[in-house]
């Protein structure tokens, strides 16, 4: 794979996300040449000191500097399709080497003439909006300002397979998992 950020070194302790398994880097190869370290945007192959099942779309992170996982995000989205955006519809999201499903809900649309925030239920061609995006599962991410590779995505129409939008992750929505319903009667 390609290193999205940081570096990998021989004997470095890493974590596989989203599974959480840990191992150490055993060997690193660039083309057919064995190397000791690899850096951002370098395409490499590596081996681990343990047998861990890795799948396309898994991430290898340093155990001392792990990425966050979330399934809900505030994003900026530009709509690039003549067919209007349908809020709450499940769209296909392509991020780096991952293909996922998510629902997108508009918070507000930007008026590109004066940058005011306007309420809207639809997006038309070339509209830009702030949206909440909810994935079917937790994903590894970084905000676009930190890492453009892990913080950007394209939106694909599930019926036509056409690219209909593109966007960037601004931040994760921290929803509590320990909320308890309170009867107010």
Positions of PLM-derived features:
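C-terminal effector/interaction modules appended to NTPase cores
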Residues: 1-185
